[in-house]
Amino acid sequence: MKQAIGFIDSGVGGLTVVREVLKQLPHEQVYYLGDTARCPYGPRDKEEVAKFTWEMTNFLVDRGIKMLVIACNTATAAALYDIREKLDIPVIGVIQPGSRAALKATRNNKIGVLGTLGTVESMAYPTALKGLNRRVEVDSLACPKFVSVVESGEYKSAIAKKVVAESLLPLKSTKIDTVILGCTHYPLLKPIIENFMGDGVAVINSGEETASEVSALLDYHNLLDSTDEEIEHRFFTTGSTQIFKDIAKDWLNMPDMTVEHIKLGK
């Protein structure tokens, strides 16, 4: 029987990481939990985000996952090291992979980070980037409206274009040549962000690099699945199953997927 890779996120954003993982590892089984009912995590304090992240973690661990991907930047910043220390399965976040990808892409060591308020205030990206390259200069920008645009399914709309243009205006006057999408919801807005920032700016989706690290970690722990056993992906949400399904079907190209509603916390 296949063991699944577990993914947790504040909502649908982590599906951008799932998509990249399934591209690279098509034999793997996925269990995904999106805490849509309590989304967004960005404005919440670190202790509350850590509590919610543990609740999601325990839910998936109880279902026998072999690895955990914290597919949410805010949750990674709040709880990754504590969870990694206490679980006996491999645990990975999305901040280090995104930082590594940005440093590969930049030509002038000037990098912008787009994130939730919680991720920006945590200084997790500047810390990670400077830990890998002390010469790098980082401009961080909180984009609190992006998550709600994605969660409402408006990420291809004229509203999305307006929100992106208004939010990213401060970055246009900087000399950054690389932008990290420091929230896993943001890749759904990537075409609009790329269009606004222009050809000279590389836009980094940490999902691709995260997927490569998932593959390497599974290989290291001898957990890679290459069998043709039947795959049964499972998707859980604390919010609307229909909204979740509409976005997930579009993003993952899984027309027959089912989504289960669950409750977390008290």
UniProtKB/Swiss-Prot annotation:
InterPro entries: Asp/Glu/hydantoin_racemase, Asp/Glu_race, Asp/Glu_racemase_AS_1, Asp/Glu_racemase_AS_2, Glu_race. The keyword Nucleotide-binding does not apply. It catalyses: L-glutamate = D-glutamate. Its EC number is 5.1.1.3. Substrate binds at D9, S10, Y41, G42, N73, T74, T184, H185. Signal peptide: none annotated. It comes from the Bacteria. GO terms for biological process: cell wall organization; peptidoglycan biosynthetic process; regulation of cell shape. Keywords: Cell shape, Cell wall biogenesis/degradation, Isomerase, Peptidoglycan synthesis. It holds the Pfam family Asp_Glu_race. GO terms for molecular function: glutamate racemase activity. The active site is at C72, C183. Pathway: Cell wall biogenesis; peptidoglycan biosynthesis. Belongs to the aspartate/glutamate racemases family. Provides the (R)-glutamate required for cell wall biosynthesis. PANTHER family: GLUTAMATE RACEMASE. This is Glutamate racemase. It comes from Listeria monocytogenes serotype 4a (strain HCC23). The gene is murI.
